[in-house]
Amino acid sequence: MKKILPFLLSLVLAFILWLHPLSIQAAPNITVTKEYLSDGSYYETVIETNMQARSYVRGAKKTVTYKNTDNKSIWYLSVSADFYFDGKTSRCTSSSVSAGSYTSTHKVLSKTSGRSDNSGWAKATVGTYMGGVHVTDVTRTIYIYCDKNGNVS
């Protein structure tokens, strides 16, 4: 009986882990890039990836933040997406958008998101205001992709 009990406990533990493979996840992978504009301001892009199990990426997120020449964040646009992949193909199973402004001179006028095949996308239009008067708009669309092996870009 003393030899059977550890074996049975090991068997039960293995069964529990088999039932819940999504509860075990790797640490998030984070990539940061910067795209400088001619006036010295820039877009900072951060991609966060959370791999869950061998065939699922949950909560992959791409955030583009517009920063001025003083490195101050002005506004941001994010797309979050879930992907399924199997080594032969991949597909986006959900996509959502988040956008906002860090200053009183910029306002998010519209935002939308969608998905198609192996990509998710988000689009936002941000208005610039001077003295309360609407001066100009900028529209930005960002995409997040997952390849057949689970690599997110």
What is each stretch, according to the model?
Residues 50-153:
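Mature secreted bioactive peptide module from preproproteins
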Residues 1-72:
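N-terminal prepro-regions of secreted/extracellular proteins
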